[in-house]
């Protein structure tokens, strides 16, 4: 009815925190975006490559980022107590140990400890936005040919 969708990435995670591109301060995006892991000139794949080699500074940045993501998920679950899918580019680089650790951090930060929810990564492939955008143009054709809904 209001012709808008939610923008959860602009919920305040840290009151008075980092300035966001939206003009507010402390938005989740300024703490949970994978770009917050990177230093000048560093790529996300490069960051995770160095992290997996055990470099201390990268581990420290990753631990801080993971704690922020856990707090954000805990806040979201306080309102919407459902399963969680971690998506976006960073999900491509998270391994099973990272996901187990994230679930543990979420539980630690939750008011009512409940590990019965499912936490998983989305299927993240290169150019997924392009593929997703194209789907609406071929959906009826695929449905007709495959005799199934896409």
Residue locations for each model-derived region?
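ATP-binding/phosphotransfer module of carbohydrate and carboxylate kinases, centering on a glycine-rich
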Residues: 19, 28-150
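Glycine-rich phosphate-binding loop of actin/hexokinase-like ATP-binding domains
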Residues: 1-31
């Amino acid at each position: 009815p209001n012709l808008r969708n939610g923008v959860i990435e602009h919920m305040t995670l840290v009151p008075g925190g980092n300035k966001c591109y939206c003009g507010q301060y402390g938005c989740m995006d300024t703490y949970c975006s994978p770009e917050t892991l990177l230093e000048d000139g560093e790529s996300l794949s490069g960051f995770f490559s160095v992290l997996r080699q055990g470099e201390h500074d990268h581990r420290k940045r990753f631990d801080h980022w993971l704690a922020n993501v856990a707090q954000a998920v805990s806040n979201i679950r306080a309102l919407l107590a459902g399963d969680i899918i971690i998506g976006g580019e960073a999900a491509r680089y998270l391994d099973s140990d990272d996901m187990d650790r994230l679930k543990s951090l979420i539980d630690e930060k939750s008011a009512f400890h409940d590990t019965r929810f499912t936490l998983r990564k989305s299927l993240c492939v290169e150019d997924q936005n392009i593929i997703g955008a194209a789907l609406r143009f071929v959906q009826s054709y695929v449905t007709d040919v495959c005799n199934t809904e896409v």
